Amino acid sequence: MAKQIRKTNKKVKMTKLPKGVVHIQSTFNNTIVTITNLKGEVISWSSAGAVGFKGARKSTPFAAKTAAQTAARQSMDQGLKQAKVLVKGAGPGRETAIRGLIDSGLQITLIRDITAIPHNGCRPPKKRRV
């Protein structure tokens, strides 16, 4: 008879921190939302793929909003009330992810775009011919 494997639950640190930083990375294929404290330690995270969207649906604005709401709910359970928002990337889920944070009840104090802009660095991909 096979031995049963015991599953251990992840321990979630319950800290009451009122302020944090929301990092939104929006690419053309996915949107990743990470919420950290002011030191940079991760409190919660979510992405369009982790919420349940697959394939081309991950790149939709609705998937980005759902991912942002999921991450915000997890962090608000740990006591987060105010947050700064740092947005990186040029994907379709930039603005809707911020709206998802506002809809979930998180108070936003700052929105900053930290997208890296090349000074004529890498060559861009060729244009699609359909």
From Swiss-Prot:
Belongs to the universal ribosomal protein uS11 family. InterPro entries: Ribosomal_uS11, Ribosomal_uS11_bac-type, Ribosomal_uS11_sf. Part of the 30S ribosomal subunit. Coiled coil: none annotated. Signal peptide: none annotated. One of its GO terms (molecular function) is structural constituent of ribosome. This is Small ribosomal subunit protein uS11c. It comes from Tupiella akineta. Keywords: Chloroplast, Plastid, Ribonucleoprotein, Ribosomal protein, RNA-binding, rRNA-binding. The lineage of its organism: Eukaryota, Viridiplantae, Chlorophyta, Ulvophyceae, OUU clade. Its main location: plastid. One of its GO terms (cellular component) is chloroplast. It is found in: Plastid, Chloroplast. The gene is rps11. GO terms for biological process: translation.
